Amino acid sequence: METFDLESHLKGAYSSFPEAKHQPVIGITANYENIDATLRDRYYKQVIAAGGTPVIIPPVADSTVIVNTLEHLDGLILTGGGDHNPLWMGEEPSPRLHNINQERDAAELMLVRLAFNRQIPMLGICRGIQTLAIALGGKVYQDIKQMVKHSQDADRSEPTHSVEIKKDSTLYNIYGAEKILVNSFHHQAVSEPGKHMRIIAKSTDGIIEAIESNEYKQILGVQWHPEWLEEEGGKIFHWLVNQANNFYAAKELHKRILTLDTHCDTPMFFPQGIKFDHRDSRILVDLHKMTDGRQDATTMVAYLPQPQIGESFSSKVAFDVQGPAQYADLIFDKIEEIVSKNRAYLSIARTPADLYSDKRKGRKSIMLGIENGLALEHDLSNVKHFAQRGIVYITLCHNGDNDICDSARGCNTHNGVSSFGAKVIQEMNRLGIMVDLSHAGERSFYDALEISQTPIVCSHSSCRSLCDVPRNLTDDQMRALAARGGVAHTTLYHGFLRKEGEADIMDAIAHLEHAIEVMGIDHVGLGTDFDGDGGIRGLADSSELINFTLQLLRRKYSEQDIAKIWGGNWLRVMTQVQNFGK
């Protein structure tokens, strides 16, 4: 019986603690008509039935409002409604175009793009699948040619035609069937899903009925209205709520742990005048992308190309400098300029304590490194010079032998580490700088392991057992590295993950897990090589790094182990090295 006693309604919240268990928050876009923002109850009732907390999102085309809204969401539903204005696709209106909804178009297209940047799980329904496609680079038919009736007269809860589903798809995983029956209320449909999405279901007349992310993101669009299909339709809402719950768990985990990428080459783009405080399409790491991917810190290196015999260093770089050392200094000057312009949000960190302090203060961190000991110019005093500039590691060589050691892509000039290279390693030990053997030849690797009095690192190196290239580490190398307390960080350069086909996030996870099997959980991590040709499908830039965490959570790694992978192991070694140098 209905009661009008407020206290009795609140009893469920007040009689135990906490007042409510956590539920993922699902934003649902509202329709707009005659100054009213409205929503049919079927949408939010399905969300509640699936275990989510629904929040209605009004159509407001204001990026500040949208961004602040998204900060509180774990999932997003794009609802049905009127046609899109074809001008958003660069097309003129067809005579068969129906009523457009100007208030919704810009607001929802912005909403999708900003949610996509943040890796928020999304479900598009009817108009919503079309919103997904348009926002992510696809296209929509203004009016479909129908061989099957796609705008039924039957009751909304009545399925009226079939949909054929691809077996390797989210929909197949949800329904366990290659064909399901759906309702239908549309005269438009997706014509091209765009580069980020793939087709996973069609009707018998070839109309696209469902699309999903082809980048391992939790994004699904369906052309029918599952909110009306009771329990069968509810399965899709359960999928979204489950994904939103996983996303919430990953976000919360990133609040508690430090996330550090140990190698990026963003300074290679400094000659192009990149803007680190913009969402700059020319680079894979910037403040926007780090924030979207909930990444705390990156190690930004001064990369020095190794000249061939007869080449000058100045001919290999864009800036007018006298030599390698001056070039490295110029790169660090420019990083310091970037930090100076963004002091409220960005800092240079030199120690693990600096990183944790920056995280507490809400700032992103950049650590400094040198990729190629060529920067030392055969002058041991330059090790101290760069230590004073705040570098945390030197990658001894790059693609080609130098005066320190032989490269994995070298000519065996020294048969390993040179006599000068041995002095460099000893001086790095003395000054608390990590010795990085990524790019080094196998003999150089073992020599450095014997010479160094502190553990060595491989900031961006994958597994030769899975991708047989000289640049990767053998299992024996990894065992030797672990035995000396070192770490090797899986990299995202496609050619080091697989020799054939396109590398993706699953390849990166496979290399990580092989390294764990060989070395143990205390000796692994991630060094993306972003902006140095690193970046793969599913982990294409810093904004997608939370997807790495999601994959680890799906594989039931503990919070402690994920923290180790995300930089804890690296910082243990850094602490040992820096303490030795004191």
Could you tell me what each predicted segment is?
Residues A249-T413, D468-H489, Y493-L526, F530-K582:
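N-terminal hydrophobic targeting/anchoring segments and the immediately downstream early-domain regions
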Residues Y216, R294-Q295, I391-Y393, L431-I433, ...:
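Glycine-enriched alpha-helix->loop->beta-strand junction motifs that scaffold or abut catalytic
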Residues G138, A353-L355, D379-V383, D406, ...:
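Distinct, well-ordered alpha-helical segments
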Residues G51, Q119-I120, G137, R294, ...:
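Glycine-centered short loops/turns at secondary-structure junctions
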Residues H414-L431, A448-C458:
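Alpha-helix-loop-beta-strand connector modules within alpha/beta enzyme cores
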Residues P24-V25, T53, P121, K139, ...:
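Proline-centered loop/turn at the N-terminus of a beta-strand
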Residues M1-I125, I134, Y141, K145-I174, ...:
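N-terminal beta1-alpha1 cap of cysteine-dependent amidohydrolase-like domains
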Residues S184-Q188, G221-P226, T259-T266, A440, ...:
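Histidine-centered catalytic micro-motifs
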